Design a protein with these regions (language model features):
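Conserved nucleotide- and phosphate/pyrophosphate-binding catalytic cores
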Residues: 1-165
Length: 165
């Protein structure tokens, strides 16, 4: 910053933390997941809503039950792979490639994994939705901590600029 250049290390310049192997999360249509595209899966929805979204919106091909399926060209498999262990993901790929395993079976497993994997987060979410004062209390505590940090920074800036009072 210009102040640091002119007056020394007044501000601590944050370092960016970027993940080199960050993945794009596909939406139900295979495109980038986005609320504006209406291709999202709300992980905090109830099981019935998640089931409806997966069964209706996750795109799969029309191959018959007995036909082998290509997991690598599947939005479904990409989503499944993101939320399950590598062991489960490999087993799903085997099932799809072998044939005799339909998209309906696969989607049922995805629904079960989504519901199970995010159960505790869903429970917390619903708790805080029903207890907004707890959220407000946490925000107030955070605001007090932030004010202390801001006051320290402002003091350091005033001192560096020669505005001690």
């Amino acid at each position: 910053s210009r102040i640091n250049h002119k007056y020394g290390e007044v501000f601590i310049i944050p370092e960016a933390k970027l993940q080199k192997n960050a993945q794009l999360i596909p939406g139900t249509d295979g495109e980038k997941m986005s609320k504006s595209r209406e291709n999202t899966i709300d992980l905090f929805d109830d099981e019935k809503s998640i089931k409806k979204i997966i069964n209706k919106n996750v795109i799969t091909d029309n191959s018959p039950l007995e036909a082998p399926k290509d997991p690598n060209n599947s939005t479904f498999y990409h989503l499944y792979n993101l939320i399950t262990s590598s062991e489960k993901s490999s087993k799903m790929a085997e099932n799809l490639k072998a044939g005799g395993y339909g998209w309906g079976h696969a989607k049922k497993e995805l629904i079960e994994e989504l519901v199970k994997s995010f159960a505790s987060q869903r429970e917390k979410f619903n708790h805080y939705i029903n207890h907004p004062q707890e959220v407000e209390d946490v925000l107030q505590k955070g605001a007090l901590k932030a004010k202390k940090v801001a006051d320290t920074t402002l003091s350091r800036v005033r001192e560096s600029l020669g505005y001690n009072s």
